[in-house]
UniProtKB/Swiss-Prot annotation:
Cross-link (Glycyl lysine isopeptide (Lys-Gly) (interchain with G-Cter in ubiquitin)): K4
Species of origin: Pongo abelii
Residue windows of the WD repeats: 47-122, 128-173, 181-217, 228-269, 275-312, 318-370, 377-404
Cross-link (Glycyl lysine isopeptide (Lys-Gly) (interchain with G-Cter in SUMO2)): K4, K101, K155, K159
Quaternary context: Binds directly to helix 1 of the histone fold of histone H4, a region that is not accessible when H4 is in chromatin. Subunit of the type B histone acetyltransferase (HAT) complex, composed of RBBP7 and HAT1. Subunit of the core histone deacetylase (HDAC) complex, which is composed of HDAC1, HDAC2, RBBP4 and RBBP7. The core HDAC complex associates with SIN3A, ARID4B/SAP180, SAP18, SAP30, SAP130, SUDS3/SAP45 and possibly ARID4A/RBP1 and ING1 to form the SIN3 HDAC complex.
Name by which UniProt lists this protein: Histone-binding protein RBBP7
Gene Ontology, cellular component aspect: ESC/E(Z) complex; nucleus; NuRD complex
GO biological process annotation, one example: cellular heat acclimation
Amino acid sequence: MASKEMFEDTVEERVINEEYKIWKKNTPFLYDLVMTHALQWPSLTVQWLPEVTKPEGKDYALHWLVLGTHTSDEQNHLVVARVHIPNDDAQFDASHCDSDKGEFGGFGSVTGKIECEIKINHEGEVNRARYMPQNPHIIATKTPSSGVLVFDYTKHPAKPDPSGECNPDLRLRGHQKEGYGLSWNSNLSGHLLSASDDHTVCLWDINAGPKEGKIVDAKAVFTGHSAVVEDVAWHLLHESLFGSVADDQKLMMWDTRSNTTSKPSHLVDAHTAEVNCLSFNPYSEFILATGSADKTVALWDLRNLKLKLHTFESHKDEIFQVVHWSPHNETILASSGTDRRLNVWDLSKIGEEQSAEDAEDGPPELLFIHGGHTAKISDFSWNPNEPWVICSVSEDNIMQIWQMAENIYNDEESDVTTSELEGQGS
């Protein structure tokens, strides 16, 4: 039995390597930017910080990323990294593919540098790290225990204490087990939601300050789910609304103004398997998406949750942890799966006619498949300052910063802007 499994693993490895070679050969035609970087340890989390600096006289801009480590029994860290991203007018020749490094392109003087700027000791791996929108120096993290930690990275030295002592600015108490979901309220400063394997969602207000030492107790604990709560997200336009999804296959909508924390305001059987992630559309107050172990992404309208608006199908394995709307385009959504693929979808193309040949590659709304990872993608983030730039991290230590070729998202035949495309609908 073991030898059969070993044989299957070897075959799969060979297929993955073959696919990667093909992907690499095609990168000059598919991308305007690809940067591949091997991290010292895998990161389970990634998020662009909103800050960007354009040094005078340079052909690049400086961007920052929040990362974490997942080590093999060594000290873990919360990491802030600095990234050089070439300007649009930087000399970039996509035909210079460096096959050994898996990188390509010459950016004039820029080689797409990625440097670790701040490392802060962390208790166990960083399951997820998210910055507070009102003050991006404040970062909340999920640990492998029940704790949620809050760090102000400006108050910590750039190099971690060699003793390994983890010294967060706040410890948030309320969960019994670990989890992944984490969401700051973009309308109410300091209000943080967290999802947990203990079947609950906790809400903290960090403005309330610690009761004892650095500990802040949960302001409310929401107990509607009957299984592991995988993800939680605040509505982006309503300060009291949030959604949660869980292994009980349900999507629940909650209102913090309600008198009850045990019953959601809306409940829907969202998928035929565990629901792993959700994301509210930043432009439309009614639209949200959920991703599931049933390999699909579902589109919902809050005005009628009985009816699923659309199902996106193309992933070959479960939508693991992440589905994110583009911060720049109302109709653009991305999802990543255990299938090592990151799919970018365009809602405005739903229902478009396509040839039989095109249909074999996927439905018309499947705009792009990023195939650069050879292991499961743990997290990804849209760059808030550079449209169409995504950073994705996978379980094999690889971090990729990439931007699909402009002719893929801009109609080649005409100079149609994205806003015009959005306006066309489906």
